[in-house]
């Protein structure tokens, strides 16, 4: 393992003995493993799949143009680790790139906070990869220090992302209008996680 990689392993709970109305143990034995790799110059094709596809950007105001994706790729490659980090999510099972997770510094309600976002390709959705990757990114943000709070702003219509926030321990602050991308407003939930709590 290279020093710059982060691994996540989620092992679901497995009862030691059968209990009334429990899910059979055999359905709870899968292990989800992902590796977070710092974003690099060769990751633009993944970015095109994540942000150039209307289905992938349904809750983000629609796909980005080729020029917007190229500019984003440059920003990702040049991001200062003191102000945020961008990771390619690799599914350890297949060795394939499954998506991205990133966090960055922003001002929110008069204070500096981290904001986090994630995206997983359709072929890898519904398998726990987003949860494993986001949990690892949260650990990285906590280790980086700097800010107490981490916020996520999924669209109120994005059920899976809102469920993931709840599962990872974020507290729902409020529902509000949010501008993303610039010039496009949508109704979002403001989820907050206390990294020092």
Role assignments for model-derived ranges:
Residues 3-45, 49-52, 86-197:
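Acyl-donor (CoA/ACP) binding surface of acyl/acetyltransferases
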Residues 65-83:
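Active-site rim helix/loop that mediates acceptor-substrate recognition in acyltransferases
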Residues 59-64, 83-90:
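A short, aromatic/hydrophobic, helix- or strand-capping loop or linear motif
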Residues 49-63:
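Helix-loop element at the rim of GNAT/NAT acetyltransferase active sites that forms part
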Residues 55-56, 78-82, 146:
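Generic structural signal for secondary-structure transition and capping sites
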